[in-house]
Amino acid sequence: MTQAEIKLCSLLLQEHFGEIVEKIGVHLIRTGSQPLRVIAHDTGTSLDQVKKALCVLVQHNLVSYQVHKRGVVEYEAQCSRVLRMLRYPRYIYTTKTLYSDTGELIVEELLLNGKLTMSAVVKKVADRLTETMEDGKTMDYAEVSNTFVRLADTHFVQRCPSVPTTENSDPGPPPPAPTLVINEKDMYLVPKLSLIGKGKRRRSSDEDAAGEPKAKRPKYTTDNKEPIPDDGIYWQANLDRFHQHFRDQAIVSAVANRMDQTSSEIVRTMLRMSEITTSSSAPFTQPLSSNEIFRSLPVGYNISKQVLDQYLTLLADDPLEFVGKSGDSGGGMYVINLHKALASLATATLESVVQERFGSRCARIFRLVLQKKHIEQKQVEDFAMIPAKEAKDMLYKMLSENFMSLQEIPKTPDHAPSRTFYLYTVNILSAARMLLHRCYKSIANLIERRQFETKENKRLLEKSQRVEAIIASMQATGAEEAQLQEIEEMITAPERQQLETLKRNVNKLDASEIQVDETIFLLESYIECTMKRQ
């Protein structure tokens, strides 16, 4: 765990949960697993506050616990899960594009609350959607339930581990902490609920839009004496499935940039066909026949079977080897080499960074060293057609920034410089780790800058919010245009200009955070898949 990662975790925890939770979370990240009383003693926080902070962290899967032999429960921070909070806006936006506003709000509620039952999610989302609708219109629970089922079917949401029923019925003393288990086949099984009702607006707390008293409208079809059918069945967002989707999108974009739109659509179809059957850590997708791919192409995509076969052959023969041929049955069996695709994307990211930092000539040398694996300085000058002095400077720049490494191969045991080969090489894994570390630093700097900008203009922001609230309440009571204009003039022209500048700066910083996180995702995925292969 590097200092840059710890600092970023600290900023994220403070921004999402406040100072006390941040203090406990960072302490656990620094020290490793610890029991409750040791955490309270070391952080100088009251036992009650530590318990509440740990409750929040466990609820959001940021801390896990384990019961040791002597019955001591130790808590351990999940740093990688804390860093995933950076990606929350991306998870929510992805769901919006795939499942519209309803899907977006379902995932948003699960991310905001950590874990929720399906019935609670459906009710919250229906209420929120009803708030945004015109008067007289409401969102039906059944419609939200259908979207939830679709999210579960495509594995974007999953059940949380729960306490097994045998443990509850045990007559002996309860364990210090429950052991949570999940059955693989039940992970995406949606409970059969008959949710009847519609979303409510906040202002109509006594009666709903239809005028029926709130107490008389049944929430569920089950008798009130019976427990809610999904009581104890909690759901969470499946972040690994989102990461699989992001990876697939990156591969499709890379194929589109390298070849054309038709090739990318074929690859997208192959990925879509195997997205549920292929695990997120698998090196290859499931083999698919040419005939299956042809039948699964999007409706209205008019290409013949012969043209499809030609495209598949081109993709299989491409030097990047994103697509590989695994057999000849069914018109040819094809797979997507996910590990090679991630390696190519990580290499392209490194090349892009070298070009931006050091210029096109350095990028040329970098690509040459990548291609040749090991190369001497004299050979770099000859192959890259760059003068000796410039080539030496550029190689030293990249060497000092850890984009390259130097390997010594002595001719004699004494390692005399005159009798030693000095070969430049690129270790993609170590370069990716170095760049990932810098990305964490960049994100932390962006968050700090955004917080500074907001703090500097705190008074002005509060004034703007007050004015907006007054205008909204006056509009609701049917105030005249002149009155509204008078309230708006409470913010002067220079203040309005300052607000616009602040908004523009914060939007730029937010966009930069998301862009840097895209690079982080590619590098993390590449490092993870490489480590698994080793």
UniProtKB/Swiss-Prot annotation:
An example molecular function term from Gene Ontology annotations: single-stranded DNA binding
Subunit structure: Component of the RNA polymerase III complex consisting of 17 subunits: a ten-subunit horseshoe-shaped catalytic core composed of POLR3A/RPC1, POLR3B/RPC2, POLR1C/RPAC1, POLR1D/RPAC2, POLR3K/RPC10, POLR2E/RPABC1, POLR2F/RPABC2, POLR2H/RPABC3, POLR2K/RPABC4 and POLR2L/RPABC5; a mobile stalk composed of two subunits POLR3H/RPC8 and CRCP/RPC9, protruding from the core and functioning primarily in transcription initiation; and additional subunits homologous to general transcription factors of the RNA polymerase II machinery, POLR3C/RPC3-POLR3F/RPC6-POLR3G/RPC7 heterotrimer required for transcription initiation and POLR3D/RPC4-POLR3E/RPC5 heterodimer involved in both transcription initiation and termination.
GO cellular component: cytosol; nucleoplasm; RNA polymerase III complex
Subcellular location: Nucleus
Family recorded in the similarity comment: Belongs to the eukaryotic RPC3/POLR3C RNA polymerase subunit family.
Name recorded for this polypeptide: DNA-directed RNA polymerase III subunit RPC3
Predominant subcellular localization, coarse grouping: nucleus
Residues annotated with Phosphoserine modification: 194
Region feature Disordered, mapped onto this chain: 161-181, 197-228
One Pfam family per UniProt: POLR3C_WHD
Keywords associated with the record: Antiviral defense, DNA-binding, DNA-directed RNA polymerase, Immunity, Innate immunity, Nucleus, Phosphoprotein, Transcription
Gene: POLR3C
The keyword Nucleus appears for this protein: yes
Miscellaneous comment as given in the Swiss-Prot or TrEMBL entry: Antibodies against POLR3C have been found in the sera of patients with systemic sclerosis (SSc).
Record's compositionally biased regions (Basic and acidic residues): 211-228
Gene Ontology biological-process annotations: defense response to virus; DNA-templated transcription; innate immune response; positive regulation of innate immune response; positive regulation of interferon-beta production; regulation of transcription by RNA polymerase III
Superkingdom of the source species: Eukaryota
Record organism: Homo sapiens
Function: DNA-dependent RNA polymerase catalyzes the transcription of DNA into RNA using the four ribonucleoside triphosphates as substrates. Specific peripheric component of RNA polymerase III (Pol III) which synthesizes small non-coding RNAs including 5S rRNA, snRNAs, tRNAs and miRNAs from at least 500 distinct genomic loci. Part of POLR3C/RPC3-POLR3F/RPC6-POLR3G/RPC7 heterotrimer, coordinates the dynamics of Pol III stalk and clamp modules during the transition from apo to elongation state. Pol III plays a key role in sensing and limiting infection by intracellular bacteria and DNA viruses.
